[in-house]
Amino acid sequence: PNVVLVPNLPGPGVALDLGWLSGTVPAGQLAEMQAAQRDRPAAQESFGIQARNLNRLNREGITISFGTDGSSPWAVHQEMEDMVRAGMSPAEVIAAATGTSADLLEIGDIGTIVAGKSADFIVLDANPLDDITNTRQIDAVYLRGSAIDREGLGARFGGASQ
């Protein structure tokens, strides 16, 4: 069937694990985010149901893509972690977040590292196939083949480079 699932799992939210964000978000804003996310019993209850559905559809061969309605750039990390918690392998989640999503959106020059495509990628300090949370350990960012000056961007926008 020509069916694609873009899960939006109601996981614990980024507010429950914010230590890694301390260099990019002001402390007062972090506290507000934590307060807004702390008690979400309905979301936590529905996570189990949605995780079972995602796992079953994945096993049945339905194409799984990637997306989040989180407005923060770090929400993608949490969504990948939630997809692994739901039963997908880190390799399946990475494929969904990169090549599968690019294919779904018909953006042919991104999504995989292949000669002739735009060289947009990140370099990690640890293997995300071993632990999906390693996607947070970003060493370098490349856009169209050029390294991004993360420290310069952080200084320019009032935050840290990490």
Could you say what each language-model-derived stretch is?
Residues V14, R144, I148-Q162:
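Extracellular/periplasmic ectodomains of large secreted or surface enzymes and adhesion receptors
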Residues P1-F47:
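Active-site gating loops and adjacent loop-to-helix segments of metal-dependent hydrolytic enzymes
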Residues A35-N127, A147:
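His/Asp/Glu-enriched, well-ordered alpha-helical/loop segment
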Residues L16-D17, V76, T133-N134, G152-L153:
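Short glycine-/acidic-enriched loop or helix-start segments at secondary-structure transitions
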Residues T135-V141:
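Short, compositionally biased
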Residues D130:
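Small/polar (Gly/Ser/Thr/Ala-rich) solvent-exposed segments
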Residues L5-V6, P90, V141:
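Short hydrophobic/aromatic-enriched beta-strand-loop microsegments
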